[in-house]
From Swiss-Prot:
Pathway given in the UniProt record: Isoprenoid biosynthesis; dimethylallyl diphosphate biosynthesis; dimethylallyl diphosphate from (2E)-4-hydroxy-3-methylbutenyl diphosphate: step 1/1; Isoprenoid biosynthesis; isopentenyl diphosphate biosynthesis via DXP pathway; isopentenyl diphosphate from 1-deoxy-D-xylulose 5-phosphate: step 6/6
UniProt-annotated binding residues for [4Fe-4S] cluster: 12, 92, 186
UniProt: (2E)-4-hydroxy-3-methylbut-2-enyl diphosphate binding residues: 36, 70, 120, 158, 214-216, 258
Catalytic activity line of the entry: isopentenyl diphosphate + 2 oxidized [2Fe-2S]-[ferredoxin] + H2O = (2E)-4-hydroxy-3-methylbut-2-enyl diphosphate + 2 reduced [2Fe-2S]-[ferredoxin] + 2 H(+); dimethylallyl diphosphate + 2 oxidized [2Fe-2S]-[ferredoxin] + H2O = (2E)-4-hydroxy-3-methylbut-2-enyl diphosphate + 2 reduced [2Fe-2S]-[ferredoxin] + 2 H(+)
Protein name: 4-hydroxy-3-methylbut-2-enyl diphosphate reductase
Family: Belongs to the IspH family.
Uppermost EC category: oxidoreductase
Binding site for dimethylallyl diphosphate: 36, 70, 120, 214-216, 258
Domain of life: Bacteria
Alphabetized Gene3D superfamilies for the sequence: 3.40.50.11270, 4-hydroxy-3-methylbut-2-enyl diphosphate reductase, catalytic domain
Residue positions binding isopentenyl diphosphate: 36, 70, 120, 214-216, 258
Amino acid sequence: MEIKMAKDYGFCFGVKRAIQIAEKNQNSLIFGSLIHNAKEINRLEKNFNVKIEEDPKKIPKNKSVIIRTHGIPKQDLEYLKNKGVKITDATCPYVIKPQQIVESMSKEGYQIVLFGDINHPEVKGVISYATNQALVVNSLEELQEKKLQRKVALVSQTTKQTPKLLQIASYLVERCTEVRIFNTICNATSYNQKAALDLSKEVDIMIVVGGKTSSNTKQLLSIAKQHCKDSYLVEDENELELAWFKDKKLCGITAGASTPDWIIENVKQKISTI
């Protein structure tokens, strides 16, 4: 099987930084899952004794705590500070940016519209910085059902697709008196998505490697399927199915921002033997 890798794929700056932080802070707790890749989390726990804790009330005083890449709600961060735990913040700088924008714009009286998944930890963290109730929408259709104010500020979950953000921005501009638009989709996400789109037009089958709970990985799969219907998401080489590759000659591979090189290489090696 011939293999072609996407031009851009895999670990982004924020994930690399977070993993380095975890490796340097052995025996710490991580408040929530550091990244959305279970196998890499297991590696960190096994080799560096960093463990996940989801409940801030269960974190002991004076304990070393790492904040996940997606950030956490403002009230949880304040709780940890008041409790006296030692905080190491691994929040991606690209996530901190929309947090700051939401806080600033809501204080100025803008209604916050956030394009994202309301259940995603990044989104939960970002909207916690709003001083008034924020609207969270995952599509233009969802936005069309919402009541809008005259002054609106638009931000996005960092892993969303730019064309869909532009659709929402256009809708708001047509209906609101004043609209502030902030493109908070991170550069690495945009590059990876474009590379996946370009590659999907060339190949017979596309394999997306990454965690099944990872937003950016699921976006890559969605993009790949636009031009390559035989696109599949796998967490590692063990999930590859031989039947997928029947009568296929060229396989494209991309990977989510939380996918380590060692997993990508294992997938690549197995496909090369088919």
